[in-house]
């Protein structure tokens, strides 16, 4: 009997000691969590977003300002969008050209930051349609607009153990290439309403996805009209435009060009023009055009099938 009582006392003492040990461990864990911060999935963390802008603000047009849009994408869904003008005077004074664009507050997780900069007079006067940065488009027939634009994309992971905040840099690049077509024209063949008609061969990109850095929509064999042929020194500018380009790629452009007068006749013609385009590059292409004369017939041999109708 005494032996049983002794065993019971020892067992009870060990249980009490074990319980004290468990309580001590729980207290240590609690203190550690209090020091480190308990993870809260709904807690937001500050992210400072800078823009690497380089020569972004070397712009001759003082009537427009760079306007920035930043889109926050999570699981292929836009969860935030911010738009604002960038003060160029302050931006020029930034060292290393890292301009503080904005601060975000985001829960922990994985994101993509998409950014777009174009030039506007007011918030509601863009040349580009930018409601969705996965499909940026150009407006048609908008004269006098500054078509330069810049894009940036950055994968971003917010860690819950970084409560102080993170700093990230958006490196902007140009998603556009531009070209100018020039030619020699006879003064006697010109009038005030000369029009260039360009027929593109193949696909012409019309929408750009900032996330993938690629063109996502195209027109097949479109025809574009450019009014107001201008003289520059001893050459005439037939057409000048900019196009979306896949990031880091070189693309070829093929087209035919006709120049018409105010009477509706075709005065000059170049059936096939080819040149290469590269993002952030401007190409000037001089075009030799055949003079159709008063009769609107090309001087020289005509090839191809001709249908003759006799009444």
Residue positions per predicted region:
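Acidic, serine/threonine- and glycine-rich low-complexity intrinsically disordered segments
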Residues: 138-229
């Amino acid at each position: 009997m005494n032996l049983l009582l002794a065993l019971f006392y020892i067992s009870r003492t060990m249980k009490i000691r074990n319980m004290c040990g468990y309580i001590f461990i729980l207290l240590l864990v609690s203190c550690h969590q209090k020091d480190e911060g308990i993870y809260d999935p709904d807690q937001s963390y500050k992210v400072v977003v800078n823009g690497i802008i380089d020569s972004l603000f070397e712009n001759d047009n003082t009537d427009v300002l760079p306007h920035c849009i930043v889109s926050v994408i999570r699981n292929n869904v836009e969860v935030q969008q911010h738009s604002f003008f960038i003060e160029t005077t302050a931006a020029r004074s930034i060292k290393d050209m890292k301009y503080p664009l904005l601060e975000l507050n985001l829960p922990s997780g994985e994101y993509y930051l998409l950014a777009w900069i174009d030039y506007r007079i007011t918030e509601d006067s863009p040349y580009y349609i930018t409601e969705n940065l996965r499909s940026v488009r150009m407006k048609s027939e908008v004269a006098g607009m500054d078509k330069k634009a810049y894009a940036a994309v950055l994968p971003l992971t917010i860690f819950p153990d970084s409560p102080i905040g993170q700093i990230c840099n958006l490196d902007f690049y140009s998603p556009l290439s531009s070209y100018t077509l020039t030619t020699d024209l006879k003064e006697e063949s010109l009038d005030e309403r000369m029009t260039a008609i360009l027929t593109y061969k193949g696909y012409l990109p019309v929408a750009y996805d900032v996330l993938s850095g690629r063109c996502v929509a195209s027109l097949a064999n479109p025809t574009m009209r450019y009014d107001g042929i201008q003289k520059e020194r001893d050459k005439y500018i037939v057409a000048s435009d900019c196009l979306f380009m896949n990031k880091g790629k070189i693309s070829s452009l093929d087209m035919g060009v006709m120049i018409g007068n105010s009477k509706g006749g075709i005065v000059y013609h170049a059936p096939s023009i080819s040149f290469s385009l590269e993002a952030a590059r401007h190409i000037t292409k001089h075009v030799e055009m055949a003079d159709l004369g008063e009769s609107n017939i090309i001087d020289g041999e005509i090839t191809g099938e001709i249908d003759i109708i006799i009444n």
